[in-house]
Swiss-Prot record:
One of its GO terms (biological process) is humoral immune response. Interacts with CR2. InterPro entries: 4_helix_cytokine-like_core, Interferon_alpha/beta/delta. Pfam families: Interferon (PF00143). This is Interferon alpha-1/13. SMART domains: IFabd. Keywords: Antiviral defense, Cytokine, Disulfide bond, Secreted, Signal. Interferons alpha-1 and alpha-13 have identical protein sequences. The lineage of its organism: Eukaryota, Metazoa, Chordata, Craniata, Vertebrata. It comes from the Eukaryota. Its main location: secreted.
Length: 189
């Protein structure tokens, strides 16, 4: 029979693992995937951004949701997952496929899909550990509203090449901010 001290130590380690640990291990390649995604999105540009200055628009990116200092990892991962999911949804539409080079778009969407799988596995891992709340509903709603504004803008601009270029630049910015958040979270580990 194990000593009471040994059992106590096992219980402390297990409880600390579920409550003290961030519980989620993104693959080491995840940061590289983020950078590759940004590079692909940069390559997708078809027209000069300077020719679309009149079409610029403030979509109201929910910056506070990506601050990182206010977040614990589990809710942050859920918000990142929602961001990537919304980007994936935006770039897999019929209107999107008409706007971009098909090969680059396929590679970009494949990278997004891989990131979604990584983040999904992370969210599932958090659920198994029993982390709550897994999702910050207000933050997720802010991300959804942000993408709703982007979609409305594209519709109003009739999915013009300049509208897509403005959206591409906006998504580059949001992906860059999400990459920064992920790196801050990784450093906290």
């Amino acid at each position: 029979m194990a000593s009471p001290f040994a059992l106590l130590m096992v219980l402390v380690v297990l409880s600390c693992k579920s409550s003290c640990s961030l519980g989620c291990d993104l693959p080491e390649t995840h940061s590289l995937d983020n950078r590759r995604t940004l590079m692909l999105l940069a390559q997708m540009s078809r027209i000069s951004p300077s020719s679309c200055l009149m079409d610029r628009h403030d979509f109201g990116f929910p910056q506070e949701e990506f601050d990182g200092n206010q977040f614990q990892k589990a809710p942050a991962i859920s918000v990142l997952h929602e961001l990537i999911q919304q980007i994936f949804n935006l770039f897999t539409t019929k209107d999107s496929s008409a706007a971009w080079d098909e090969d680059l778009l396929d590679k970009f969407c494949t990278e997004l899909y891989q990131q979604l799988n990584d983040l999904e596995a992370c969210v599932m891992q958090e659920e198994r550990v029993g982390e709550t709340p897994l999702m910050n509903a207000d933050s997720i709603l802010a991300v959804k509203k942000y993408f709703r504004r982007i979609t409305l803008y594209l519709t109003e601009k009739k999915y013009s090449p300049c509208a897509w270029e403005v959206v591409r630049a906006e998504i580059m910015r949001s992906l860059s901010l999400s990459t920064n958040l992920q790196e801050r979270l990784r450093r906290k580990e």
